[in-house]
Every structure is written in structure tokens, then in C-alpha cells.
Amino acid sequence: MAKVVGIDLGTTNSVIAVMEGGQPTVVPNSEGFRTTPSVVAYTKNGDLLVGQIAKRQAVINPGNTFYSVKRFIGRKFSEIEQEAKQVPYPVQADGKGNVRIFCSAKDKFFAPEEISAQVLRKLVDSASQYLGEKVTQAVITVPAYFNDSQRQATKDAGKIAGLDVLRIINEPTAASLAYGLDKKSNEKILVFDLGGGTFDVSILEIGDGVFEVLATSGDTHLGGDDFDKKIVDWLIDNWKRIEGIDLSKDKQALQRLTEAAEKAKIELSNVTQTDINLPFITATADGPKHLDQTLTRAQFEQLTSDLIERCRKPVEQALTDAKLSKQDIDEVVLVGGSTRIPAVQQLVKDLLGKQPNQSVNPDEVVAIGAAIQAGVLAGEVKNILLLDVCPLSLGVETLGGIMTKMIPRNTTIPTRKTEIYSTAVDNQTNVEIHVLQGERELAKDNKSLGTFRLDGIPPAPRGVPQIEVTFDIDANGILSVTAKERSTGKQQSITITGASTLDQSEIERMVKEAEKNAEEDRKKREQIETKNLAESVYYQAEKMGLKDNAQELKNAIDQLDYEGMKNLTQQVQTLIAQKASETSNAKTNGKASEKEDVIDADFKAQE
């Protein structure tokens, strides 16, 4: 069977891993790094850049460099208005209220799924190169607290990247697979996952190959980006107070501040103070201005104290839902780069009364777990049973705008639940089923996943018709809803995909565009390689004295005639080989003739 890869599609960085010889292995990217920045950029010429190369040019191209896109995936614009203000690229709503990102270099709008697909494609290309075979199937991880539309959108991103996404699994669950693969004894573990843009807490019982999620909680608006933003705001406020200049209006300066803030945050995990130096941050009539600030760890902890405090409630909620106390937890596993922050580690110790287990690499553990799950699906890994849960309650809107729960949060999936409902008024011939996700009592306060109508109900007094509503959640955590009128057998169903912000025709168009882009990228790479080889052969031909042939090849290079370059390169390489052979033979013959001229003589030793 073809290899199935595991992918951690992160807010800040992404990782891909695969099972090799029964062990999960992280696949390095084409630059040789084990993690790939989740950054996509388009140059002024419209060329696509992904990963480290895109991140490096962000300062000079902030409006066309897209990062932290995971915060927007599967969401409506009304849900992310605050986050949209934190990035230097334009984020807008389309006619349906979906999030769209404007790229001035291409003069077009992109869906977040399209941007994420470019990151996935880079990872998969690296894996295909590494394995020596084309990779088409994957397991992709998502934050445990992602709702249905965010999960579906992640699956769509995989599809646009040319992948068959076999399974969507929760990041903390994947981390537990990596941590507990060789554990034989039963343990209750708490996975504390604070990434670049999301925060999850999951409690699992693991042992003898069974991984059962007992409860999950989280906050999809909390992550390392928010810690960076606190430093950026502090720098902007200080600069405004000292210099009277507002740097938040300058996109290039803002990008430099964001990068400096991330660097300072990382440094403060190891040292107690750091210097932030940004020469030529701006200029006035008096000349250039240079930013030079010192940030201590104590100041950083004070700036981010509200964010640290926000990590507390999901931990307490997960313990309550699992009906456990902190004494029942055997191990605490830290996941995500932001868990390196000392104040975060201290909070975990205070909340759970134990030292966190740091035996796993927080940047790679999720991808490794995804690779193990991929191995299970591919039949490479045996004797593992994964029992995950749905993170949020699912239900329907009933009379009076009430949210009636069908499947409570933390129900083990896959699952199926049926309830009987009826009509609200006499002679009602249709019903509208409004599907909701969330924990609030009123329908309007929860996330709307979609609506559909069941027609053809026979006229009858209110309360008489029996409408059977079935909720079905698959192993990916994606929901299907069916409504059936019992007396007629008429039914209507919906797979909740509308909230993913893309319809099927849009996805198909994006798949074609992505394939076209991949083909264009391949052609560009081929052309660069052809030109590089032609130039190398041209210099060799010059040295060998093949002036006419070299000039002909040089003309093809100057005219960017790639077909001509290919043909002439082959011809000139043949001539170079012939000339080298002739030179070698001439030298050999010369040595032989020299030897023939030598007269052998006997010398007598003098006594």
C-alpha cells in the first residue's frame, strides 16, 4: 500500500512525518529543516514562495506575505474581525460573510483554505522526494476545539493540495499517541497544547494500545501570536510616548516589530532579559530613527498575565468534564512551542501540582502522532485503538429559539443519535432544521452549522407529525444530519459543509488552479536547471577552445531559448567529451613515444 503521511498543519509552523521501519520519522523539507513556517507569499512578479523563503522576505513584502492563516480557516469574517486587524495583509468578507484574503501581487482574493493548501503541497512534495514515491494520502491534525466548519475547511485545504485526507484527528490526541506508543501500564494523562494560534487541553486514559479521550476543552483564539502581539503593542506604545510617532500605521515597521517580538519571546524562555534593536525603523525630517528597547522576563510576564490566566479555565473545565481531580492525573504532556514560556510551565505546575513531562519535542510530537495514526490506517501499525470525542455539543433550534442538544460535548466518536420532534403549528407541511454547535442555551448564541428543509409533511394538528432527526458524526468529527417524516418516509439530509466557506465547484476550481501552479513551478524549476547547466557547459567549452560552439550556446542562453539550450548543451557536452578523450589519448601516445626513445644501458658499479 502507498505511504500515508501524518501532517501537523500549524498556525506558525507545520511538520510532516511518516512511518519507516515501524517507527515514526519526521521528514525534513527541501531546505533541510524539520519544521516549515506556515507562510505563503507572492512576489511582485507573481511568483509563489512557501515556508522559510516566504518568511525571510516578509519585511519588504508585508501585504503579500500570508501567515497565521489557520486562525481564519473555516470561519466567518464576523468571528475574526479583531484577529484580522493584527496582520499586515488585507482580510475582508465576501458577499456571504466568508473570510477572503486579498493578494495585490496577483490582484485576486484567496480563501484561507487555498493558502493552507500551498503549505500542505510543499510538505507533501518534500515527503514525495524523501520517500521516492508520490504521496497522495494523509492524516491531518486540527486543534481539539476546532468546530465542524473548521474541520471541514481543513479537509478542503487537503483536497486543494491534491490529497485524499483519510482522517482528521485532534492535535492533543495525536500527541498522546506519540507519547504513549510504547506505554504498557494504564495512565491518565493531560495534554496541554498551546500553539501559535490555538489552545487545547485533553485528558486521556492510555494503556495497552487503547487511547481513550475522556474530555477536551480549549480556546481557538489563544496562542503564541497573542503573546507576540502584547510585545508589539508595548513597543508601539513606548515609541509613541518617546518619539511621538505611531508605528502601527507603517506596514513594514509593523512586520519588523512582529518578527522582533517573536524573537524576544523565544529568547526570554532562556534568559531573564533581551534587547530589541531595530535600526532605521522609521525616518523623520531630522533623519532616520533607531529603536532600542530592553524587555525583561518580569515585564513580559506582566504584559501577558491575562493570556496566562486564560489558560487556567480550559484545564479546570477538562478536569470537571472528565470527573477527575488533579491527583488523578499521572502525567502532564506539554505540546506546542508556546509551552516553552516559563510562566506557562509554572501555571501548569500550580494547576496540577506536578512537573510537566518534557520527554517529547513539543514542535514535532503532533506530526509524529499523526504519522502513527496514518500507519494504523495503512495497516503498518497494529493493536492501537483510538477513541476520540466531539469537543462541542451539537443540537437543533427548537420552538422559542432554544438550542436543544442532541449530542453532548465529550461524547466518544464516531457516534449516532436520533430524536423525535414534531410541528409547532397546525397543518404545517414543512420544517426547517437549524443545526447548531456550542454550549449556550439560546440558539442565537451558538455557532450555526447550516439549515435545511424537510417538505411534504401531511397536514395535521400541531404535535401529531413525527419527525425523526438523526445526527451522525464520523471519525473525523464531521457531522451529517438526516430528517425523516415517519408516516410518509420522506427524508432530507445534509452533510455540514456549507460552513466550510467553499462550495464544491469552488474547491474543484482551486484544485485545478493548484495543479496548474504546481505544473508552472515545475516548469520554472526545470528552466532554471536547464539554464544553470547550459552556463556551466558554456564555460567548459570556452576553456576547451570550442569558441564557435560556445558562442552558439551563449546566444541561446541570452535569448532564453530553453529548447535550444537543451539541444546545444547535449551537443557541446558530446564535443567536450570527445576533445577530452583526444587530449587524453595524445598524452598517452606522447608518453609511449618518449619511452621508445629511451636507451636501456647497463652500468657497472665501481669497486
Curated annotation (Swiss-Prot):
Coiled coil: none annotated. Residues 579-591 have a biased composition (Polar residues). Keywords: ATP-binding, Chaperone, Chloroplast, Nucleotide-binding, Plastid. SUPFAM superfamilies: Actin-like ATPase domain, Heat shock protein 70kD (HSP70), peptide-binding domain. InterPro entries: ATPase_NBD (IPR043129), Chaperone_DnaK (IPR012725), Heat_shock_70_CS (IPR018181), HSP70_peptide-bd_sf (IPR029047), Hsp_70_fam (IPR013126). It is found in: Plastid, Chloroplast. PROSITE patterns: HSP70_1, HSP70_2, HSP70_3. Residues 592-607 have a biased composition (Basic and acidic residues). Pfam families: HSP70 (PF00012). Residues 579-607 are annotated as: Disordered. Acts as a chaperone. Belongs to the heat shock protein 70 family. This is Chaperone protein dnaK. It comes from Cyanidioschyzon merolae (strain NIES-3377 / 10D).
